[in-house]
Amino acid sequence: KLITHASQALEEKNVFVLTQERAVDFPNLPSIDLFVLDEFYKLDPREDMQRAMTLNHAFYKLTKKARQFYLLGPNIQSIPDGFPERFKCQFIRTDFATVVTELIPVRAKKGKELDRLLDLCDEVNGSTLIFCASPKKARQIVEKLAEKSSTQREGMPEAATWVGENYHPEWTLVKGLKSGVGMHHGRMPRALAQLCVKGFNEGKLPFLVCTSTLIEGVNTQAKNVIIFDNKIAKKKYDFFTFNNIRGRSGRMFKHFIGNVYVFHEPPQEELPLVEVPVYSQDEGTTSESLLIQLDEYDLQRKSRERLEPYYRQHILSIDVIRQNTGIEPRDQIALAHYLAEKPLKIQKLAWSGYPDWSQLRALCDTIWHFFIHEPGRVGGVSSGIHLAYKIKQMRGTPFRSMIELEIKKGGDPDEIVETALEFIRQWPQYRFPRLAMGVCRIQNAIANKMNMPNLVAEYSF
């Protein structure tokens, strides 16, 4: 039986297909015969610290349950010393490729790069993947390609109509789908991104403009790859990422020779060592929220010293801290002390089911004050009250109506649509449920500690 989430009943034989978050939250996992982790380089925290900590937690949890494991990843130079001995495994490095890659430099006058790209798209034959630095750049390229659209491109007109009706007709993706140009970046809903990949592989979309999201585990049938930018956002990519991008050209049994057109010099040839925080436990790359999940005998001496203050304190049990995966112990304890010292605050958080406005605002203010430490806007949100407003708006307003309301205030439809989608991806689908349940558990722990059962909350429904 295929199991993708914890609500499914298990059979005698099961295949689990889980995201790292679902793997961490999955209760009572049975013994596992074989655990496979694809793209294991994401264990390294240098690109995305928060997601890497979650993946390390999932890796640790599953290795405890699995008889065997198999980690896969491209272009890896080595793994940390001692890792094979600790986990009883062997690292095998290979340069084998199923297709031949032709690297073709592209010269463009300064300021005329986009014009040269459009000319190149007229010159190439076959399905063409275009890599660029950001969603904004992707939209710009899609728009220009759509303006130069050929009547020979089949496109996906029915999909374009549906997207226009449910999101907004002026979103660049709509123009692209009509003109045979797909788009793929991290702000898009996964279903729409997969729709574009499907249309590209079926030949309905001869061009697919993407950011770095497409190189992470998405299979395409591209004869050509055009590497237009040498950056991801504002940071220059390394040789590892460059290799991953150019590796999207060609496809075994489909295109045996892949053409890679590059607008910039390739980076210096240096492949990475993958850091694995759950093993190294380096203070600079391993969060305390990860360390607190490890069994004591798996902790290094320096890690035990880091965790000692949390085991000595009495305001919040280690069990509660561990249940709140991904939330730093010091932040949880700070909130626990705050609630214990201000009983009136507990009353504002003591609700069950659906909150009213004042309860929702109290929760969002608490989340923002204690758990959010990133500077500036986070997923389109700038404060606790802003978060509460946007969640309340989502509860009572269809997505298309939300977009229309924002556009009436003035603004670019592309930016408004994608900012709204980024909010949904970051908050309702990821951060908010996890952080809200963290507040709920801490609130209940303090209410019980103060012998106030009437102030116990229940946010799950």
Annotate each predicted stretch with a short phrase.
Residues 1-15, 24-27, 108-117, 122-209, ...:
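Conserved C-terminal RecA-like helicase domain
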